[in-house]
């Protein structure tokens, strides 16, 4: 039987998913092969129910199996990622949103932390995963560097109990490694760490799970993205052209045919500088409205503009995110960002789905 299954897989390996150089077997789209007595049946897994290539791929599979292996009957069950069972830990998670940046140093983790707090203050149930494996900063920003998550048994399976601070459930690799030691891991190790935190955490009911991704679009970054189910992605940038150029790469990655994750919009961080002694003044030290212009060009939302103010730095250093003070100017900026993100997720109509990275 194994030899027959291998023959079928070898033939189906000749079927390329349209628009990519990868076969449907390499993309793990072929499952549950059964064959015998002139009949073969298997399951084809597609990302979306409205995939325009469903018919063409099925037709090609049927033709090749009849031509090369002589099957008279080919039965193909078509299923979509939305229909597949979620991992136990994510069964009650409504939306998973990636917070990303094409470039380091643009304040992505600061935005992710304060967005999580703002969503929690708006009444949502929120979780935050620090997937920046090589530079985890969430424990510091939430003032819980000394926290030690423990294991709990849920449904006969051991899961990690997240740390809870300011109404946000938190998991970070920073809780499990020496803060003074460099994390020198290859891609698979980093991917496994993320998967363990996301699918091995006891998240229970969440309206939003935010994933603070590493900066960039490297192979490790793409591997991390494909291990989780995403409702959408947020791209953080400063107004500078050097940062915007990398933001474009991030947008293109999420919108590429092999990933197809909705980009909810852009966040312009460090939009302007306002000194404490001159609260009405705005100094555009990194340029003006760069992210707004990029959002317009790409047909995306500008989800928020976050200024540079001293309290953001102080909040990050002290473990007290500025979004906790929702009546302050900067707190209001993050509350507006939270409202816009919630609206954008609702408008996409996308529930969490897995992605497969192709080249």
Which residues fall in each region the model found?
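Short, non-transmembrane amphipathic alpha-helical segments
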Residues: 5-8, 29, 36-75
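Switch II (G3) loop of P-loop NTPases
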Residues: 150-152, 173-188, 195-223
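Conserved catalytic-core segment of NTP-binding enzymes
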Residues: 59, 207-208, 214-314
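Phosphate-binding loop that captures ATP/GTP phosphates
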Residues: 119, 124-180
């Amino acid at each position: 039987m194994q030899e027959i299954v291998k023959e079928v897989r070898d033939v189906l390996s000749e079927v390329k998913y349209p628009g990519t150089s990868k076969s449907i077997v390499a993309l793990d789209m072929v499952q549950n092969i059964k064959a015998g007595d002139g009949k073969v049946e298997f399951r084809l897994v597609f990302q979306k129910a409205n995939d325009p290539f469903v018919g063409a791929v099925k037709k090609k599979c049927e033709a090749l199996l009849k031509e090369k292996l002589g099957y008279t009957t080919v039965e193909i069950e078509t299923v979509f990622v939305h229909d597949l069972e979620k991992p136990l830990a994510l069964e009650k998670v409504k939306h998973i949103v990636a917070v990303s940046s094409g470039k380091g140093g643009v304040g992505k983790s600061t935005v992710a932390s304060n967005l999580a707090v703002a969503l929690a203050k708006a009444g949502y149930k929120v979780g935050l995963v620090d997937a920046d494996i090589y530079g985890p900063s969430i424990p510091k920003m939430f003032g819980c560097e000394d926290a030690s998550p423990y294991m709990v048994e849920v449904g006969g399976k051991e899961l990690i109990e997240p740390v809870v601070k300011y109404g946000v459930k938190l998991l970070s690799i920073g809780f499990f490694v020496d803060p003074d030691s460099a994390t020198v891991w290859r891609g698979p190790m980093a991917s496994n760490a993320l998967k363990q935190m996301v699918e091995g955490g006891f998240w229970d009911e969440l309206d939003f799970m935010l994933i603070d991704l590493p900066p960039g679009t490297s192979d490790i970054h793409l591997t991390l993205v494909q291990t989780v189910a995403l409702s959408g992605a947020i791209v953080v940038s400063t107004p500078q052209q050097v940062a915007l150029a990398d933001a474009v790469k991030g947008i293109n990655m999420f919108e590429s045919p092999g990933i197809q994750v909705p980009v909810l919009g852009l966040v312009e961080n460090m939009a302007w500088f306002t000194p404490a002694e001159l609260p009405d003044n705005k100094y555009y030290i990194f340029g003006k409205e760069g992210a707004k212009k990029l959002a317009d060009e790409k047909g995306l939302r500008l989800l928020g503009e976050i200024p540079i103010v001293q309290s953001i730095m102080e909040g990050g250093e002290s473990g007290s995110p500025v979004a906790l003070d929702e009546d302050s100017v900067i707190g209001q900026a993050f509350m507006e960002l939270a409202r816009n993100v919630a609206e954008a997720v609702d408008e996409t109509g996308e529930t969490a789905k897995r992605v497969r990275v192709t080249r």
